[in-house]
Amino acid sequence: MKLKPIEVAEILQKEIANINCLSELEEVGQVISVGDGIAKIYGLANVKSGEVVEFKSGVKGLILNLEHDSVGAVIMGDYSKVKQGDNVKRTKDVLKVLVGKALLGRTVDALGNPIDGKGDIVSKEYRHIEMKAPGIIERTSVSEPVQTGIKAIDSLIPIGRGQRELIIGDRQTGKTAIAIDTIINQKQAHSLTNESDKIYCIYVAIGQKRSSVAQIVKKLEDAGAMDYTIVVLATASEAASLQFIAPYSACSMGEYFRDNGMHALIIYDDLSKHAVAYRQISLLLRRPPGREAYPGDVFYLHSRLLERAAKMSEEKGGGSLTALPIIETQAGDVSAYIPTNVISITDGQIFLESDLFYKGIRPAVNVGISVSRVGSAAQIKAMKQVAASVKLELAQFRERESFSQFGSDLDSATKAQIEHGKRLVEILKQEQYQPCPVEEQIVSIYVGTKKYLNDIPLQKVKEFEKAMLAEIRLNRKDILESIKTEQCITEEIEQQLKAFLENFVQAYCVVP
C-alpha cells in the first residue's frame, strides 16, 4: 500500500502536534567535599537555607550554611553513598513530614518513614517540620489539666494543657518513667467517647539506645497505650542530622492534633542530646563556637521548638499541644548552659534528685525547687482543697528533720510534725507504670493531710493505702464517682469520706 505525499504530511503534522516538548529546568551543583555527614556543594546559586537537596545516589540533604561561593548541607541518611564530584539537584522544597491519625500506633524515623515492619502509613497530609509558633491572639491561657497519674506531680506540680513543663535530673533518676506513666495514664480518657477528654501522645527518642527504646515501645504496647501514641526515633547510631530534625518532625505531627481542635502531649527525650547533635553539626559546618562549644543560636534551637506548644483560642478550635521536654544534668548541676536555657523557656520544672532516688523515694521529685508556673489554674478544685497545705508541710518537715540530726532532745510537737512529714512522704511514693486515677489520688492525699495515718506504723503506710483504696473501690465507689463528677469536695462528700475513713482505720488497727 502506497501512501500519498499529502497523507504522509498529515501523519507527520499529527505526530508533531502530539509531541510533549516541555523541558524542565533543573538547577544542579557539585559536591566539592564530603565527610562526617556534611557536604560542601558548589554551583547552587539560588538555593535557600532549610531547602532539601537530592544527591546522585538518591540520599537527601538539608541546606544549613550559605557561604560566599558554596553551600553546606547535612546529609540525612547514609553519607557513605555521597562522593566528591557527585551531582546535587535542588528540590525547591523544604523538609516535610507525614501527619495524621494514621500515624497512631506506629514507630517512625525522623523523616516520618515507618520502621516497625507494619507496612506503609496511609495518609495524604504533609506538614513542614519548621512551623511558626502561634501568635498571642491565637492563644488562650492554660485552664484544663493533664493528669499524669503521679500523686507527687498532680497534687504539687500540676500540669495544664498547652503548658511546657521541664523534667530535669541526673541519669537514672526516673525522668523517662514519669513521661511513660503520663502516656499510660491517658488510656482511661481514650476509653471515653468524648473527643475533648482524649490526649494523643507523641514520644520522641533522641540519641537513646535502641534497646531502651524497644523496652519503652514494648511497655506501651503491653499497657494498651500505643493505640493513641506515635513513637519517633532518632537513636544514638543514627546521623546527627536526623537527631537534630527528629523533635521538629514530631512537633509537626503534634500540631496536626492541636490545629484540628484535639489535644496532644509530646515528650522530647531528651533535649540535652539534641543540643549535642546540633553542636556537632555546627562545629563541622565551621560555625564559631560559644560557651561549652555550643553555637550562638542554641537558645533559639530550643525556644522555636518549645514555643510551638500552646493552648489555642476557641476561634482557632480550642486544641492544645503540651510539651514535656527532658534534660539530663551532670551531678545535679542545673546551672549549666543547656539546663538554664530550657528552664527559662519552659513554664516550670520537675526536678528529680539522685539522693532521693537512692533513699527509695520514687518518683524522686524535689518538691522544694520543682515548680509549675501556670498549672495551678488547670488543677481541679478537689485536688486544690486537699493538697493546698502539702508543700508547706513537707518544707517544714525537711527543715525540722535536718535540725533533728544535731540533737535528739526534741519536744513532742516537733516529733509529731516529723512523724507526720514522714507519712506524707510515704503516701506520695508510687511504683513505676502504676498511674493512679485523680479521684483516688485525692482520697490518698486527704488521708495523709488529715492525720489518719498517725496511728499506722511507717512501714505499713503503703500497705494501708493499698487496702484502703481496694475497700473504697469495692464498697464505696459512690464517693469516688462523686469526686470525679463534682470535681470538688463538698460538705456532703467530706462527711461520707470521714465516716468511711474513721470506720476503716478503726477496723484496720484492730486486725493483728
UniProtKB/Swiss-Prot annotation:
Belongs to the ATPase alpha/beta chains family. It is found in: Cell inner membrane. InterPro entries: ATP_synth_asu-like_sf, ATP_synth_asu_C, ATP_synth_asu_C_sf, ATP_synth_F1_a_nt-bd_dom, ATP_synth_F1_asu, ATPase_a/bsu_AS, ATPase_F1/V1/A1_a/bsu_N, ATPase_F1/V1/A1_a/bsu_N_sf. One of its GO terms (molecular function) is proton-transporting ATP synthase activity, rotational mechanism. Keywords: ATP synthesis, ATP-binding, Cell inner membrane, Cell membrane, CF(1), Hydrogen ion transport, Ion transport, Membrane, Nucleotide-binding, Translocase, Transport. It catalyses: ATP + H2O + 4 H(+)(in) = ADP + phosphate + 5 H(+)(out). Its EC number is 7.1.2.2. It comes from the Bacteria. It comes from Rickettsia typhi (strain ATCC VR-144 / Wilmington). Its main location: membrane. SUPFAM superfamilies: C-terminal domain of alpha and beta subunits of F1 ATP synthase, N-terminal domain of alpha and beta subunits of F1 ATP synthase, P-loop containing nucleoside triphosphate hydrolases. The record marks S370 as: Required for activity. GO terms for cellular component: plasma membrane; proton-transporting ATP synthase complex. This is ATP synthase subunit alpha. ATP binds at G169, D170, R171, Q172, T173, G174, K175, T176. It is an enzyme of class 7 (translocase). F-type ATPases have 2 components, CF(1) - the catalytic core - and CF(0) - the membrane proton channel. CF(1) has five subunits: alpha(3), beta(3), gamma(1), delta(1), epsilon(1). CF(0) has three main subunits: a(1), b(2) and c(9-12). The alpha and beta chains form an alternating ring which encloses part of the gamma chain. CF(1) is attached to CF(0) by a central stalk formed by the gamma and epsilon chains, while a peripheral stalk is formed by the delta and b chains. It is a peripheral membrane protein. Produces ATP from ADP in the presence of a proton gradient across the membrane. The alpha chain is a regulatory subunit.
